[in-house]
Design a protein with these regions (language model features):
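A late-sequence structural motif
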Residues: 107, 256-296
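Short helix-boundary/capping micro-motifs
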Residues: 10-27
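A short LG(V/I)-centered, amphipathic sequence patch enriched
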Residues: 41-60, 77
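N-terminal winged-helix
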Residues: 30-31, 88-119, 123-128, 132-136, ...
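Flexible hinge/capping segments at coil-to-helix
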Residues: 157-168, 172-194
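Secondary-structure junction motif
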Residues: 179, 192-213, 278-287, 296
Length: 296
């Protein structure tokens, strides 16, 4: 399978038309494009397109291949950029960092500031996501580093622990009965409609940290990142498990954070692939991070 074929496929998927892709994007004849896509379908052994007079759409297999094709082209772009800039004496290039929502991202920001002071032509690309999103992109080579909230399996990675802990609790409306308490217990959660992140719902370790199987509670919704979940809470749709300090709960905010008792906290780690071949910008970031943490 050639990269050209993947580019052709993505153009057809984007334009939803063989003729538009051929004439407006790829500048090849339509028969040439059709032949290339037919050969791709034969190579993969699946039908990728549903062709009609109005437009061309993707089959279920086509949608799955589109996701992989986009990942391949993104990785190719990273690689081309990395090697084009590697020969320059001054460190120029990109660092790709992913992480969950946590106040500890300030360590990443401080390391980037330190790195930028020395290497101002390094660009940083930040991706927000839960541990599954981040480790998947890390494994695919689309990220250089990931900031993960524990408990998390980090056996596949090199890592440094951050000197910080995040506190777990509930995000509730200020007029919610639990808002009047200084702390909440697991017993307080009985019959309370709850929102939990998809990551925590899938992790036995989190149930162990909480001291209760989340599936035994009244979880009415799951979320990926906390902001949209906070809108549900603001509308009175329950209380959300979350970490302290991710949202502004002061002033005119309708929301407040109530920590658990006994206190439940999570450590934080920055991870990267074992035995990596770092680009110069990625190596510069790791050096800056370790300096920020007093490790170098």
């Amino acid at each position: 399978m050639e990269l050209r074929t993947i580019r052709y496929f993505l153009a057809v998927a984007e334009q939803e038309s063989f003729s538009a892709a051929a004439n407006n994007v790829l500048f090849v004849t339509q028969p040439t494009l059709s032949r290339q896509m037919q050969e791709l379908e034969e190579e993969l052994g699946v039908q990728l397109f549903v062709r009609s007079n109005k437009k061309t759409t993707l089959t279920e297999e086509g949608l799955r291949f589109k996701k992989r094709a986009q990942e391949i082209m993104e990785l190719v772009g990273h690689t081309e950029k990395e090697f084009a800039e590697a020969s320059k004496e001054e460190i120029v290039g990109d660092v790709y960092i992913g992480g969950g929502e946590t106040k500890a991202f300030s360590f990443i920001a401080a390391a980037c500031k330190r790195m930028q002071a020395k290497h101002p032509k390094i660009r940083m690309h930040i991706t927000s996501g839960n541990a599954q999103d981040v480790t998947e992109k890390l494994d695919q080579g689309l990220l250089d580093f990931g900031l993960l909230v524990e408990p998390v399996d980090k056996s596949k990675y090199e890592f440094v622990e951050l000197p910080a802990k995040d506190t777990w609790g509930l995000l509730v409306r200020k007029d919610h009965p639990l808002a009047k308490k200084g702390f909440v217990t697991i017993r307080d959660l009985e019959n309370v409609p709850l929102l939990a992140s998809r990551q925590t719902m899938m992790m036995r370790e989190f149930s162990g940290l909480l001291g209760r199987d989340l599936h035994s509670l009244n979880v009415i919704a799951t979320y990926n990142l906390i902001y949209n979940a906070s809108v549900f809470v603001e509308q009175g749709l329950g209380a959300a498990f979350c970490l302290e300090g991710l949202l502004n709960t002061g002033g005119k905010s309708k929301l407040t954070f109530v920590p658990f008792t006994p206190l439940r906290t999570s450590g934080l780690v920055v991870v990267w692939k074992k035995s990596p071949v770092f680009s110069k910008p990625a190596a510069a970031f790791l050096h800056s991070l370790k300096q920020e943490l007093g490790m170098e």
